[in-house]
Amino acid sequence: TSWATQIGYTQPQYSVSAIVNQKYNDWSDSYFSTSLGKERTYNDADSTNIGLRAWWRPQETGTATPSISVGFDTSETDATSNSNTTMYFVGLNWQDMFQADDRIGLAFGQPQKREGETTDPFAWEAYYQFQVNDSVSVTPAVFGGSDRNGTAGSDITGAVLETTFKF
């Protein structure tokens, strides 16, 4: 059994929202990003989960001021000690910096981490999207993370090139 309540307020230049979710007996979440998270699956405990989100964007694009997105989640369960989790993210996006419709973005954050973890997982990405013409955009990006899945030394880096066609 589960219920959720969400509230939000949005204006053209900003938005804030919050969600509260309560799960009761026999709930399960099959994915957690840290190794100790596996102990939280398939239990008969109750869980209270809170998510907070906000974004803001400048009135004019093409300036050094980015749009900003932030988020924070927390989850508390009465199943076991140290079973609470937290995560956060921050995203920055600059639009129209070099030419119309281009975007530069940075994002970083902590994947869901359980209390008592001895590692501090961290993830990041950076990209630049540019319009080749009205129908084609190209986005090179790099990304990385440290202590992936809560495992010390399990670091990753990579790159991707995305091409989008609009018809």
Regions found by a protein language model. Name each.
Residues P58, G71, N82-M97, R103-F108:
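Extended oligomerization regions of viral-like shell subunits
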Residues A18-Q22, I68-T74, V90, I104-Q110, ...:
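Transmembrane beta-barrel strands of outer-membrane/channel proteins
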Residues D155-F167:
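Outer-membrane beta-barrel "beta-signal"
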Residues N93-S137:
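C-terminal hydrophobic structural anchor segments
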Residues T5-I7, L52-A54, V90-L92, A126, ...:
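Membrane-embedded beta-strands of outer-membrane beta-barrel proteins
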Residues Y24-S30, E60, T74-N82, F98-A100, ...:
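Gram-negative outer-membrane beta-barrel proteins
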Residues W3-T5, Y9-A18, Y24-D29, Q59-I68, ...:
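Repeated loop/turn-to-beta-strand initiation elements of outer-membrane beta-barrel proteins
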